[in-house]
Protein backbone atom coordinates (compact mmCIF):
# COMPACT_ATOMS: atom_id res chain seq x y z
CA UNK A 1 0.00 0.00 0.00
CA UNK A 2 2.85 2.38 0.79
CA UNK A 3 4.18 1.97 -2.76
CA UNK A 4 0.72 2.71 -4.19
CA UNK A 5 0.47 5.89 -2.11
CA UNK A 6 3.94 6.97 -3.21
CA UNK A 7 3.10 6.38 -6.87
CA UNK A 8 -0.19 8.23 -6.44
CA UNK A 9 1.53 11.39 -5.26
CA UNK A 10 4.16 11.17 -7.97
CA UNK A 11 1.32 11.27 -10.50
CA UNK A 12 -0.59 14.07 -8.73
CA UNK A 13 2.36 16.16 -7.51
CA UNK A 14 2.11 18.90 -10.13
CA UNK A 15 -1.65 19.07 -9.74
CA UNK A 16 -1.22 19.57 -5.99
CA UNK A 17 1.47 22.22 -6.48
CA UNK A 18 -0.76 24.09 -8.93
CA UNK A 19 -3.56 24.18 -6.36
CA UNK A 20 -1.20 25.34 -3.61
CA UNK A 21 -0.02 28.18 -5.83
CA UNK A 22 -3.62 29.07 -6.69
CA UNK A 23 -4.53 29.45 -3.02
CA UNK A 24 -1.35 31.46 -2.31
CA UNK A 25 -2.45 33.98 -4.95
CA UNK A 26 -5.42 34.91 -2.75
CA UNK A 27 -4.16 37.65 -0.36
CA UNK A 28 -6.05 36.30 2.63
CA UNK A 29 -4.83 38.75 5.26
CA UNK A 30 -7.50 39.43 7.88
CA UNK A 31 -9.42 42.46 6.64
CA UNK A 32 -12.29 44.74 7.65
CA UNK A 33 -15.50 42.92 8.52
CA UNK A 34 -18.18 43.09 5.86
CA UNK A 35 -21.75 41.75 5.87
CA UNK A 36 -21.46 37.97 5.98
CA UNK A 37 -17.66 38.19 5.91
CA UNK A 38 -16.44 38.40 9.53
CA UNK A 39 -12.75 38.16 8.61
CA UNK A 40 -12.86 40.25 5.45
CA UNK A 41 -13.52 39.68 1.77
CA UNK A 42 -10.28 37.89 0.86
CA UNK A 43 -10.60 35.43 3.74
CA UNK A 44 -14.13 34.60 2.65
CA UNK A 45 -12.81 34.13 -0.88
CA UNK A 46 -10.08 31.70 0.21
CA UNK A 47 -12.56 29.55 2.15
CA UNK A 48 -14.85 29.40 -0.89
CA UNK A 49 -11.90 28.42 -3.07
CA UNK A 50 -10.92 25.58 -0.73
CA UNK A 51 -14.45 24.22 -0.48
CA UNK A 52 -14.87 24.32 -4.26
CA UNK A 53 -11.54 22.55 -4.74
CA UNK A 54 -12.47 19.86 -2.24
CA UNK A 55 -15.70 19.17 -4.11
CA UNK A 56 -13.78 18.94 -7.40
CA UNK A 57 -11.56 16.35 -5.72
CA UNK A 58 -14.59 14.26 -4.80
CA UNK A 59 -14.95 15.23 -1.15
CA UNK A 60 -17.88 16.66 0.78
CA UNK A 61 -17.29 20.29 1.75
CA UNK A 62 -19.11 23.33 3.07
CA UNK A 63 -18.26 26.79 4.36
CA UNK A 64 -19.79 27.76 7.70
CA UNK A 65 -20.62 31.47 8.03
CA UNK A 66 -17.40 32.37 6.20
CA UNK A 67 -15.43 31.40 9.29
CA UNK A 68 -14.32 27.85 8.50
CA UNK A 69 -14.46 25.38 5.64
CA UNK A 70 -15.29 21.82 6.70
CA UNK A 71 -14.24 18.91 4.47
CA UNK A 72 -15.20 15.29 5.18
CA UNK A 73 -13.65 12.09 3.91
CA UNK A 74 -16.83 10.05 4.37
CA UNK A 75 -20.20 10.01 6.11
CA UNK A 76 -19.01 8.28 9.29
CA UNK A 77 -18.61 9.97 12.67
CA UNK A 78 -15.42 12.00 12.96
CA UNK A 79 -12.58 10.20 14.73
CA UNK A 80 -9.89 12.63 13.56
CA UNK A 81 -9.89 16.41 13.20
CA UNK A 82 -7.18 17.91 10.98
CA UNK A 83 -6.80 21.60 11.83
CA UNK A 84 -5.25 23.95 9.27
CA UNK A 85 -5.70 27.58 8.27
CA UNK A 86 -5.78 29.62 5.08
CA UNK A 87 -5.29 33.13 6.45
CA UNK A 88 -1.82 34.65 6.48
CA UNK A 89 0.02 37.43 8.27
CA UNK A 90 0.47 40.73 6.41
CA UNK A 91 2.87 40.46 3.48
CA UNK A 92 5.39 42.99 4.76
CA UNK A 93 8.19 44.13 2.49
CA UNK A 94 11.72 43.12 1.60
CA UNK A 95 10.73 40.10 -0.50
CA UNK A 96 13.56 39.10 -2.84
CA UNK A 97 12.68 35.92 -4.74
CA UNK A 98 9.13 36.94 -5.64
CA UNK A 99 6.22 39.09 -4.52
CA UNK A 100 4.29 37.62 -1.56
CA UNK A 101 1.20 36.60 -3.51
CA UNK A 102 2.96 35.65 -6.75
CA UNK A 103 4.11 32.09 -5.98
CA UNK A 104 7.10 30.63 -7.80
CA UNK A 105 9.09 27.42 -7.59
CA UNK A 106 12.84 27.92 -7.63
CA UNK A 107 15.58 25.40 -6.87
CA UNK A 108 13.06 22.92 -5.55
CA UNK A 109 11.43 25.41 -3.16
CA UNK A 110 7.98 26.98 -3.35
CA UNK A 111 8.02 30.69 -2.46
CA UNK A 112 4.98 32.79 -1.52
CA UNK A 113 3.14 34.01 1.56
CA UNK A 114 1.50 30.99 3.18
CA UNK A 115 3.51 28.36 1.30
CA UNK A 116 4.50 26.76 4.62
CA UNK A 117 2.17 28.58 7.05
CA UNK A 118 -0.28 27.14 6.36
CA UNK A 119 -1.67 27.01 2.84
CA UNK A 120 0.80 24.45 1.51
CA UNK A 121 0.22 21.97 4.35
CA UNK A 122 -3.55 22.56 4.20
CA UNK A 123 -3.73 21.62 0.52
CA UNK A 124 -1.37 18.68 1.15
CA UNK A 125 -3.81 17.42 3.80
CA UNK A 126 -6.65 17.81 1.32
CA UNK A 127 -4.77 15.72 -1.24
CA UNK A 128 -4.02 13.10 1.40
CA UNK A 129 -7.77 12.72 1.92
CA UNK A 130 -8.27 12.50 -1.85
CA UNK A 131 -5.60 9.78 -2.02
CA UNK A 132 -7.37 7.70 0.63
CA UNK A 133 -10.61 8.00 -1.33
CA UNK A 134 -9.14 7.39 -4.79
CA UNK A 135 -7.10 4.37 -3.66
CA UNK A 136 -10.16 2.76 -2.13
CA UNK A 137 -8.71 2.63 1.39
CA UNK A 138 -11.66 1.73 3.60
CA UNK A 139 -11.96 3.58 6.90
CA UNK A 140 -14.58 2.85 9.53
CA UNK A 141 -14.45 6.43 10.84
CA UNK A 142 -14.32 9.88 9.28
CA UNK A 143 -11.38 12.24 9.03
CA UNK A 144 -12.49 15.88 8.92
CA UNK A 145 -10.32 18.72 7.62
CA UNK A 146 -11.19 22.01 9.31
CA UNK A 147 -9.79 25.03 7.48
CA UNK A 148 -9.87 28.28 9.43
CA UNK A 149 -9.45 31.88 8.32
CA UNK A 150 -8.55 33.69 11.55
CA UNK A 151 -5.66 31.71 13.05
CA UNK A 152 -3.16 34.52 12.63
CA UNK A 153 -5.37 37.08 14.37
CA UNK A 154 -7.61 35.75 17.14
CA UNK A 155 -8.54 32.10 16.37
CA UNK A 156 -12.21 33.03 16.19
CA UNK A 157 -12.53 30.43 13.43
CA UNK A 158 -11.85 27.36 15.57
CA UNK A 159 -13.62 28.97 18.52
CA UNK A 160 -16.73 29.21 16.36
CA UNK A 161 -16.35 25.68 15.01
CA UNK A 162 -16.04 24.02 18.40
CA UNK A 163 -19.01 25.98 19.70
CA UNK A 164 -21.04 24.06 17.09
CA UNK A 165 -19.32 20.66 16.96
CA UNK A 166 -17.78 18.29 19.47
CA UNK A 167 -14.05 17.69 19.38
CA UNK A 168 -13.01 14.47 17.69
CA UNK A 169 -11.19 11.95 19.91
CA UNK A 170 -7.94 12.77 18.09
CA UNK A 171 -6.69 15.83 16.25
CA UNK A 172 -3.50 17.18 14.76
CA UNK A 173 -2.45 20.26 12.85
CA UNK A 174 -0.06 20.30 9.87
CA UNK A 175 1.25 23.66 11.06
CA UNK A 176 4.52 22.92 12.87
CA UNK A 177 7.79 21.07 12.30
CA UNK A 178 8.74 17.49 11.49
CA UNK A 179 8.60 14.94 12.81
CA UNK A 180 6.07 16.05 15.44
CA UNK A 181 5.49 18.68 18.10
CA UNK A 182 3.40 17.51 21.03
CA UNK A 183 3.59 20.73 23.05
CA UNK A 184 2.01 24.07 22.23
CA UNK A 185 3.27 26.78 24.53
CA UNK A 186 0.79 28.98 26.29
CA UNK A 187 1.01 32.66 25.67
CA UNK A 188 0.11 36.26 26.27
CA UNK A 189 -1.05 38.21 23.24
CA UNK A 190 -2.24 41.61 24.36
CA UNK A 191 -2.04 45.39 24.05
CA UNK A 192 -0.71 48.23 26.15
CA UNK A 193 -1.12 52.00 26.05
CA UNK A 194 -0.22 55.26 27.76
CA UNK A 195 -1.49 58.83 27.47
CA UNK A 196 -0.10 62.25 28.39
CA UNK A 197 -0.52 65.90 27.50
CA UNK A 198 1.45 67.19 24.56
CA UNK A 199 4.62 69.07 25.49
CA UNK A 200 6.19 71.33 22.88
CA UNK A 201 9.63 71.97 24.40
CA UNK A 202 12.40 71.12 21.92
CA UNK A 203 14.04 68.86 21.04
CA UNK A 204 11.30 66.25 21.08
CA UNK A 205 10.07 63.03 19.49
CA UNK A 206 7.07 63.63 17.24
CA UNK A 207 6.30 60.03 16.29
CA UNK A 208 7.67 56.50 16.25
CA UNK A 209 5.90 53.53 14.71
CA UNK A 210 6.46 50.12 13.21
CA UNK A 211 5.15 46.59 12.91
CA UNK A 212 2.41 44.95 10.84
CA UNK A 213 1.18 42.19 13.18
CA UNK A 214 1.67 41.26 16.80
CA UNK A 215 3.10 37.86 15.94
CA UNK A 216 5.66 39.06 13.38
CA UNK A 217 9.04 40.56 14.30
CA UNK A 218 9.06 43.82 12.29
CA UNK A 219 11.71 44.63 9.72
CA UNK A 220 10.77 48.30 9.34
CA UNK A 221 10.13 51.20 11.73
CA UNK A 222 10.24 54.97 11.42
CA UNK A 223 10.34 58.07 13.60
CA UNK A 224 10.25 61.85 13.33
CA UNK A 225 12.40 64.00 15.64
CA UNK A 226 12.10 67.78 15.97
CA UNK A 227 14.66 70.34 17.10
CA UNK A 228 17.91 68.37 16.91
CA UNK A 229 20.70 68.64 14.36
CA UNK A 230 21.07 65.86 11.84
CA UNK A 231 24.67 65.37 12.95
CA UNK A 232 23.63 64.46 16.50
CA UNK A 233 20.89 62.11 15.30
CA UNK A 234 23.16 60.37 12.80
CA UNK A 235 25.85 59.90 15.44
CA UNK A 236 23.40 58.19 17.81
CA UNK A 237 22.01 56.05 14.99
CA UNK A 238 25.51 54.96 13.94
CA UNK A 239 26.30 53.88 17.48
CA UNK A 240 22.98 52.03 17.73
CA UNK A 241 23.58 50.36 14.37
CA UNK A 242 26.97 49.10 15.55
CA UNK A 243 25.38 47.69 18.71
CA UNK A 244 22.26 46.15 17.17
CA UNK A 245 22.81 45.49 13.47
CA UNK A 246 19.72 47.57 12.67
CA UNK A 247 20.36 49.82 9.66
CA UNK A 248 19.35 53.48 9.98
CA UNK A 249 18.84 56.30 7.51
CA UNK A 250 18.33 59.92 8.60
CA UNK A 251 16.86 62.54 6.28
CA UNK A 252 15.39 66.02 6.79
CA UNK A 253 11.62 66.26 6.55
CA UNK A 254 11.86 69.84 5.25
CA UNK A 255 15.38 70.66 4.02
CA UNK A 256 16.69 74.11 4.89
CA UNK A 257 15.03 74.55 8.30
CA UNK A 258 17.49 74.99 11.19
CA UNK A 259 17.35 73.05 14.47
CA UNK A 260 16.38 76.08 16.54
CA UNK A 261 13.49 76.71 14.15
CA UNK A 262 12.12 73.24 14.80
CA UNK A 263 13.91 71.29 12.09
CA UNK A 264 12.41 67.81 11.73
CA UNK A 265 14.29 64.64 10.81
CA UNK A 266 12.88 61.40 9.47
CA UNK A 267 14.57 58.24 10.81
CA UNK A 268 14.06 54.88 9.13
CA UNK A 269 15.15 51.63 10.76
CA UNK A 270 15.53 48.37 8.83
CA UNK A 271 15.89 44.99 10.49
CA UNK A 272 14.95 41.41 9.62
CA UNK A 273 11.47 39.96 9.91
CA UNK A 274 10.65 36.54 11.37
CA UNK A 275 7.89 34.79 13.28
CA UNK A 276 7.48 35.98 16.87
CA UNK A 277 7.92 32.44 18.22
CA UNK A 278 11.58 32.53 17.11
CA UNK A 279 12.57 36.19 17.57
CA UNK A 280 16.31 35.42 17.56
CA UNK A 281 16.02 34.52 13.88
CA UNK A 282 15.18 38.14 13.06
CA UNK A 283 16.22 41.63 14.12
CA UNK A 284 13.45 43.80 15.56
CA UNK A 285 13.43 47.20 13.85
CA UNK A 286 10.94 48.61 16.38
CA UNK A 287 13.01 47.88 19.49
CA UNK A 288 16.14 48.97 17.65
CA UNK A 289 14.56 52.32 16.81
CA UNK A 290 13.24 52.73 20.36
CA UNK A 291 16.78 52.17 21.63
CA UNK A 292 18.12 54.87 19.31
CA UNK A 293 15.33 57.34 20.12
CA UNK A 294 15.72 56.82 23.86
CA UNK A 295 19.43 57.63 23.50
CA UNK A 296 18.81 61.03 21.89
CA UNK A 297 19.33 64.18 24.02
CA UNK A 298 15.65 65.18 24.00
CA UNK A 299 13.93 67.51 26.44
CA UNK A 300 12.40 65.95 29.53
CA UNK A 301 8.71 65.14 29.02
CA UNK A 302 6.13 62.58 30.06
CA UNK A 303 6.25 61.02 26.62
CA UNK A 304 10.05 60.73 26.53
CA UNK A 305 10.11 59.26 30.05
CA UNK A 306 7.51 56.69 29.01
CA UNK A 307 9.50 55.79 25.91
CA UNK A 308 12.58 55.24 28.05
CA UNK A 309 10.52 53.01 30.33
CA UNK A 310 9.40 50.98 27.33
CA UNK A 311 13.04 50.66 26.24
CA UNK A 312 13.92 49.30 29.67
CA UNK A 313 11.13 46.70 29.68
CA UNK A 314 11.72 45.57 26.07
CA UNK A 315 15.44 46.18 25.41
CA UNK A 316 16.65 45.25 21.96
CA UNK A 317 17.55 41.55 21.63
CA UNK A 318 16.12 40.60 25.04
CA UNK A 319 14.06 37.73 23.65
CA UNK A 320 13.30 36.06 26.96
CA UNK A 321 11.75 38.72 29.20
CA UNK A 322 14.82 39.12 31.41
CA UNK A 323 14.46 42.89 31.80
CA UNK A 324 10.71 42.55 32.33
CA UNK A 325 11.30 40.11 35.18
CA UNK A 326 9.42 37.19 33.64
CA UNK A 327 12.24 35.01 32.26
CA UNK A 328 11.65 31.30 32.91
CA UNK A 329 11.91 27.88 31.28
CA UNK A 330 11.31 24.20 31.89
CA UNK A 331 12.77 21.00 30.47
CA UNK A 332 9.62 19.94 28.64
CA UNK A 333 8.47 23.09 26.84
CA UNK A 334 11.58 25.25 26.82
CA UNK A 335 12.09 28.96 27.32
CA UNK A 336 9.63 31.85 27.51
CA UNK A 337 9.84 34.42 24.72
CA UNK A 338 8.62 38.01 25.00
CA UNK A 339 8.58 40.87 22.55
CA UNK A 340 6.78 43.98 21.42
CA UNK A 341 6.38 43.89 17.65
CA UNK A 342 3.95 46.76 17.06
CA UNK A 343 4.35 50.26 18.51
CA UNK A 344 2.71 53.58 17.66
CA UNK A 345 4.05 56.61 19.56
CA UNK A 346 2.52 60.05 19.02
CA UNK A 347 2.79 63.38 20.87
CA UNK A 348 -0.08 62.54 23.25
CA UNK A 349 0.35 58.82 23.84
CA UNK A 350 1.51 55.44 22.68
CA UNK A 351 0.09 52.00 22.10
CA UNK A 352 1.64 48.67 21.31
CA UNK A 353 1.23 44.91 21.22
CA UNK A 354 2.90 42.15 23.22
CA UNK A 355 3.63 38.63 21.98
CA UNK A 356 4.82 36.07 24.52
CA UNK A 357 5.14 32.30 24.16
CA UNK A 358 5.01 30.85 27.66
CA UNK A 359 6.26 27.43 28.83
CA UNK A 360 4.32 25.02 31.02
CA UNK A 361 5.81 26.55 34.17
CA UNK A 362 4.46 30.04 33.40
CA UNK A 363 1.34 31.26 35.18
CA UNK A 364 -0.77 34.36 35.66
CA UNK A 365 1.06 35.04 38.91
CA UNK A 366 4.65 34.66 37.68
CA UNK A 367 4.16 36.11 34.21
CA UNK A 368 1.09 38.26 33.46
CA UNK A 369 0.87 39.92 36.89
CA UNK A 370 4.61 40.61 36.95
CA UNK A 371 4.59 42.15 33.47
CA UNK A 372 1.51 44.24 34.25
CA UNK A 373 3.18 45.64 37.37
CA UNK A 374 6.36 46.35 35.42
CA UNK A 375 4.41 48.32 32.82
CA UNK A 376 2.38 50.14 35.48
CA UNK A 377 5.60 51.34 37.09
CA UNK A 378 6.43 53.16 33.84
CA UNK A 379 2.96 54.65 33.42
CA UNK A 380 1.93 52.12 30.79
CA UNK A 381 -1.35 50.23 31.12
CA UNK A 382 -1.84 46.68 29.92
CA UNK A 383 -5.24 45.91 28.43
CA UNK A 384 -7.46 45.06 31.45
CA UNK A 385 -8.97 42.15 29.50
CA UNK A 386 -5.57 40.47 29.11
CA UNK A 387 -5.63 36.72 29.67
CA UNK A 388 -3.00 34.04 29.28
CA UNK A 389 -3.60 31.29 26.77
CA UNK A 390 -3.05 27.92 28.47
CA UNK A 391 -0.41 25.54 27.08
CA UNK A 392 -1.28 22.23 25.45
CA UNK A 393 0.76 19.11 26.13
CA UNK A 394 0.15 15.56 24.94
CA UNK A 395 2.71 13.21 26.56
CA UNK A 396 5.01 11.48 24.10
CA UNK A 397 3.99 8.00 25.28
CA UNK A 398 0.35 8.47 24.26
CA UNK A 399 -0.73 5.98 21.53
CA UNK A 400 -1.79 8.72 19.10
CA UNK A 401 1.60 10.44 19.36
CA UNK A 402 3.40 7.13 18.91
CA UNK A 403 1.27 6.32 15.85
CA UNK A 404 2.11 9.63 14.19
CA UNK A 405 5.81 9.19 14.94
CA UNK A 406 5.72 5.65 13.59
CA UNK A 407 4.14 6.84 10.33
CA UNK A 408 6.83 9.48 9.93
CA UNK A 409 9.60 6.96 10.56
CA UNK A 410 8.15 4.46 8.08
CA UNK A 411 7.77 7.02 5.31
CA UNK A 412 10.92 9.06 5.87
CA UNK A 413 13.17 6.26 7.06
CA UNK A 414 14.46 8.24 10.02
Where are these regions (language model features)?
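Buried hydrophobic packing segments
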Residues: 50, 122-132, 161, 225, ...
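N-terminal helical capping/dimerization or prosegment-like subdomains
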Residues: 1-83, 89-92, 351-353
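Midchain, well-structured core segments that form catalytic/ion-binding scaffolds
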Residues: 152, 158-359
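Active-site metal-coordination/substrate-binding segment of hydrolases
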Residues: 79-147, 153, 168-169
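C-terminal structural cap/anchor segments
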Residues: 348, 361-393
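Glycine/charged-rich beta-loop-alpha catalytic/anionic-binding loops adjacent to active sites
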Residues: 101-114, 263-273, 410-412
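Active-site-adjacent substrate-binding region
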Residues: 232-249, 393-414
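Zn-dependent metallopeptidase/amidohydrolase metal-coordination segment
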Residues: 8, 80, 343-348, 388-390, ...
